[in-house]
C-alpha cells in the first residue's frame, strides 16, 4: 500500500491517517508471484497488522491498484481478524480491466478481478464494506499532456499486442 496515495487521500478526505501494518520490506510485489499459493503466503509474510491501531475502528485502506484481488482480499481478512469494525477500500487508479503487455506481469484478462465483474461484485469477493476507484477521466486530467498508456484501463493499446494466450509464460 503506497503511503503517498494514502497520505494524499487523507489530505483530500480529512479522515485521520495512520499505519495499520508493519511491512516487511524484503518481500517484493506480491501480485506478480507466479502461483496463487505463493501470492497468498507472500501477503502474510509481508504485512503484520498493528492490532492496537485497527481494533474497534473503521479502516479506509488505500492502494494503487487491484490486479487479481488476492492481496486486497487477504489484507481485508487480516484487518477484520484484528478487530476492524469495517474496511473500506479506495484505489488510486481505475479498474485494471485488460492485460498489460508493456510492463505488468499479468498474462491474461481472465486473471484480472475487474475484467468481467462490476465494482459491487469485486467488493463482495474481496470482503470490503465499500470499494471505490479513481475514474479514468480524473486520471487523464491529472496527467494532462504528459501522455501515458492507459490500455490496462481502457483496452486501447498503442500498438499491436500478442494474440496468443501467454498465461503459461510465467509459470
Please report, for each region that a protein language model flagged, where it lies by residue.
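PRPP-associated nucleotide enzymes
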Residues: 1-171
Amino acid at each position: 500500500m503506497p503511503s503517498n496515495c494514502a497520505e494524499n487521500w487523507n489530505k483530500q478526505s480529512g479522515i485521520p491517517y495512520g499505519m495499520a501494518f508493519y511491512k516487511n520490506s524484503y518481500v517484493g510485489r506480491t501480485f506478480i508471484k507466479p502461483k496463487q499459493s505463493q501470492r497468498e503466503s507472500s501477503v502474510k509474510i509481508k504485512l503484520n497488522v498493528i492490532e492496537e491501531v485497527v481494533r474497534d475502528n473503521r479502516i479506509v485502506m488505500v492502494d494503487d491498484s487491484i490486479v487479481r484481488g488476492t492481496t486486497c482480499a487477504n489484507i481485508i481478512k487480516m484487518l477484520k481478524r484484528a478487530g476492524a469494525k469495517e474496511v473500506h477500500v479506495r484505489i488510486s487508479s481505475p479498474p485494471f480491466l485488460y492485460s498489460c503487455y508493456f510492463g505488468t506481469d499479468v498474462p491474461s484478462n481472465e486473471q484480472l478481478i475487474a475484467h468481467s465483474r462490476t465494482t459491487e461484485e469485486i467488493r463482495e469477493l474481496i470482503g470490503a464494506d465499500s470499494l471505490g476507484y479513481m475514474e479514468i477521466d480524473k486520471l487523464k486530467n491529472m496527467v494532462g499532456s504528459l501522455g501515458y498508456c492507459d490500455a490496462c484501463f481502457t483496452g486501447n493499446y498503442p500498438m499491436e499486442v500478442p494474440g496468443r494466450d501467454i498465461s503459461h509464460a510465467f509459470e
